[in-house]
Amino acid sequence: MKDYYAILGVSREASQEEIKKAYRRLALKYHPDRNPGDKEAEERFKEINEAYAVLSDPKKRAAYDRGHLEAPEYRPEDLFDLFFQEVFGVRGHRRPPRGEDLEAEVEVELQDLLHGAEKEVRYTRLVPCEACGGEGGRRTPCPTCRGQGVVESYRQSFFGTVVTRTACPHCKGRGYLLAETCPACRGRGRVPREERVRVQVPPGMDEGHLLRVPGYGNLGPGGPGDLYLRIRVRPHPHLERQGPDLVYRLRLGLAQAALGARVEVPGLEGPIPLDIPPGTGHGEVFALEGGGLPLPGGRGRGTLRVVVELAVPKKLSPKAQKLLRAYAEEVGEEVAPEGFWERLKGFFRK
């Protein structure tokens, strides 16, 4: 994964204002118009815009910081639009804007992450209103900007006349006003619609990972945005996840721990036999290599760690008590005398 902070030359703790300032400085320095024919500067410009597109969005930045964001893909026109918007305050080349990106959740079972799985996700996105064709109503050109969406202001400087283009405040950069509002969408031009999309969840995905589905965000005049699916892993009844490794807490009886036993532990592909050697103590760990989840880059699988927890019985039958007392006497361990606790309880009841 690229280091977007290094690309912009800022620290991981940088504020949004510091990130924006660094972006503007670098974007102006490496803009293709200032470096004609320089392929290296062109690639640098793309990287700078890609880094800013992620770090300027709080949600994407948080996911990136956790290592849960897939490498985004941007069209060249998107990067130039971002440059014009952030540096000059207007959209470059007057290209219609894409729809907004969306975020939804996809729930998976722990077993799904072993080989990957196809999942269907339901979510709601905005689509063009059929009643008005997505126009929001009957349009009329904005008289302030004459349908251009931008206004120009002029000022004299030492270098001559400086022209500044900004979004038209009257129509908010749209270039038109609504003479009549569509009742179906109330002038918004878009209406919500429930959608379904089937996605392939790759093996070994982390909890909270953002899975990008291009073109399934809100629809806008310039095309759709993207859909980001946040991975949610349902808790397993027996196994805990620790990265690519799994943990199973095995409760052993005193006799099993002392004498040894053959047990079965739950695995993602079925029960796994495990031989417990005599004299196993509380907290001992047995590592079953390859019993975990897939490692990044197809480098095998993690480990299933079996942690022993001794189950001390709270109640014993008279026969079991007798056997344990005989064992304690054999090994020289001092225990409470027979009937001690009953006599003590009776004392406090008086």
UniProtKB/Swiss-Prot annotation:
Q: Which PROSITE patterns match?
A: DNAJ_1 (PS00636), DNAJ_2 (PS50076), ZF_CR (PS51188)
Task: Tell me which stretches of the chain form a coiled coil.
Answer: none
Location in the cell reads:
Cytoplasm
Q: Which UniProt keywords apply?
A: Chaperone, Cytoplasm, DNA replication, Metal-binding, Repeat, Stress response, Zinc, Zinc-finger
* Zn-finger (CR-type) residues: 116-194
InterPro entries in the cross-refs? DnaJ, DnaJ_C, DnaJ_domain, DnaJ_domain_CS, HSP40/DnaJ_pept-bd, HSP_DnaJ_Cys-rich_dom, HSP_DnaJ_Cys-rich_dom_sf, J_dom_sf
Please classify the protein's predominant subcellular localization into one broad category. cytoplasm
UniProt keyword Chaperone, yes or no: yes
What is said about the domains?
The J domain is necessary and sufficient to stimulate DnaK ATPase activity. Zinc center 1 plays an important role in the autonomous, DnaK-independent chaperone activity of DnaJ. Zinc center 2 is essential for interaction with DnaK and for DnaJ activity.
**Could you identify this protein by its name?**
Chaperone protein DnaJ 1
What organism, scientifically named, is this protein from?
Thermus thermophilus (strain ATCC 27634 / DSM 579 / HB8)
